């Protein structure tokens, strides 16, 4: 039986007729308890999951009767446990779920509940169980942007309670709308609480523009561009293109691309960014996708291939710098779509990485909700169909559905990309982002100009990240596929 697949702007459309596993339905367990969430999870993962062929419990012929299927669905009462223990493949590090699909999809668009402080967390103390935070940057137009708090400041407590591994989640990421940070100083590696406190309030619907800083520097006759980009959010692709238009107008010949705090996001935004750096020649292959075995049986090479872009999604001509070299600032918080830019550019451009090793996330995902009747697209989230999602099930899953490889077939960077020039951030000298004296940027400028000067890049107290605030947003470090793709699919 023929089925038709349409993937457009992150929405996969699959026309489904009845098949063996379509005939199995299991909305209730033997005792009448609802297992609709588990039912949705299994059916969605059976179609789309990258490791479907490797996970025995997701096999097309796993169940011979409804009773057997229902017994499986009720084997874990908690949907989270069901996903983790029954469906997730052992090699899968990044698939996740949410009990609130609206929060998840808002976050993909750059909308979150936040007070605007983006921070990293650090373990310290005799047993490495105490925690302190350091401010990375402040989101514009947030509550924090109106308060006396800035990059480089440290905090050790919340509402008078010292942070540790047991309480930091509740204190920093709990339901409390308002909290007070108890600040601290650092000198010679020693952290000392001070008398400063900052009250902060989380805002619902805070929108973060990821195009954070755009600068040009004229140093010894060389025009150097700098862009700090903090998330691949396709709603801001035009802003990104405008930033490159500014850099192009300024006549920059070298670019420092700061992705140190960028956890990823839209695959298409990564394609546009790479085109702005290198080329808008649509004959050049950017990346290719690999899906699960049963989907790959019907995909053509053209279906799986993405090329560099000459226009944004809105039809605006790409502002490209046509560079043959780019300097990328990285840390362990540089993940997914950030790494995709590095990998996609590598065959064409000399990518000089400065900082520390990236996260190592090379798979892409799709957002799935309990909408099995979407016209030709079972379970794939579609904004216009929110009223068709099962009102009794607000869960969403974000499973990995494929892996990207560059134009020469390389995709093996699960250990991350090591820097060409290692330089850790220094808690005692984080510097001002965008300032040419900020250590990572200064190092890049030194490499570009070839003038070493007398700058001392010794790191007194290196950042050894435990986790960061962005890892507690619904989208975390996710890479989301959003591309036009039209396929004929015949599922056995």
Q: Where do the PLM segments sit?
A:
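C-terminal "post-core" interaction segments
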Residues: 231, 235-242, 247, 252-254, ...
């Amino acid at each position: 039986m023929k089925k038709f697949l349409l993937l457009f702007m992150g929405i996969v459309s699959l026309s489904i007729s009845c098949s063996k596993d379509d005939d199995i339905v299991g909305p209730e367990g033997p005792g009448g308890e609802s297992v609709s969430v588990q039912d949705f999870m299994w059916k969605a993962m059976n179609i789309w999951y990258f490791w479907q062929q490797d996970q025995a419990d997701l096999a097309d012929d796993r169940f011979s009767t409804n009773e057997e299927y229902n017994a499986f669905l009720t084997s874990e009462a908690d949907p989270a446990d069901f996903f983790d223990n029954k469906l997730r493949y052992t090699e899968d590090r990044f698939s996740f779920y949410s009990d609130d699909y609206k929060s998840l999809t808002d976050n993909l668009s750059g909308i979150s509940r936040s007070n605007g402080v983006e921070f990293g967390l650090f373990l310290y103390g005799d047993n490495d169980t105490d925690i302190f935070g350091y401010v990375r940057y402040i989101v514009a137009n947030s509550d924090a942007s109106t308060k006396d708090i800035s990059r480089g400041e440290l905090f050790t407590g919340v509402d008078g309670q010292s942070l540790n591994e047991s309480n930091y989640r509740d204190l920093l990421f709990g339901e409390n709308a308002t909290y007070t940070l108890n600040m601290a100083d650092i000198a010679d590696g020693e952290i000392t609480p001070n008398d400063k406190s900052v009250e902060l309030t989380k805002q619902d619907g805070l929108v973060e523009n990821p195009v954070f800083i755009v600068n040009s520097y004229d140093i010894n006759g060389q025009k150097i561009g700098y862009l700090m980009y903090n998330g691949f959010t396709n709603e801001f692709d035009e802003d990104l293109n405008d930033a490159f238009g500014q850099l192009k107008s300024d006549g920059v010949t070298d670019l420092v691309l700061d992705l140190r705090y960028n956890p990823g996001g839209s695959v298409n935004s990564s394609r546009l960014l790479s085109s702005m750096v290198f080329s808008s020649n649509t004959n050049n292959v950017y990346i290719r996708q690999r899906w699960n075995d049963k989907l790959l049986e019907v995909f053509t090479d053209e279906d799986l291939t993405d090329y560099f872009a000459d226009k944004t999604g809105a039809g605006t001509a790409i502002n490209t710098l046509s560079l043959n070299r780019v300097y990328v600032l990285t840390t362990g918080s540089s993940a997914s779509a950030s790494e995709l830019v590095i990998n996609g550019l590598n065959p064409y451009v000399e990518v000089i990485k400065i900082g520390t090793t990236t996260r190592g996330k090379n798979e892409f995902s799709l957002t799935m909700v309990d909408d099995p009747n979407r016209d030709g697209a079972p379970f794939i989230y579609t904004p216009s169909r929110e009223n068709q999602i099962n009102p009794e099930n607000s869960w969403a899953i974000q499973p990995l559905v494929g892996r990207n490889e560059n134009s020469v077939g390389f995709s093996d960077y699960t250990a991350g990309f090591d820097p060409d020039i290692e330089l850790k951030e220094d808690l005692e000298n984080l510097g001002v982002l965008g300032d040419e004296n900020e250590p990572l940027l200064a190092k890049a400028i030194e490499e570009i100009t070839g003038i070493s000067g007398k700058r001392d890049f010794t790191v007194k107290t290196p950042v050894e990240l435990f986790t960061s605030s962005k890892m507690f947003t619904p989208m975390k470090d996710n890479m989301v596929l959003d591309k036009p793709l039209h396929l004929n699919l015949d599922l056995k």
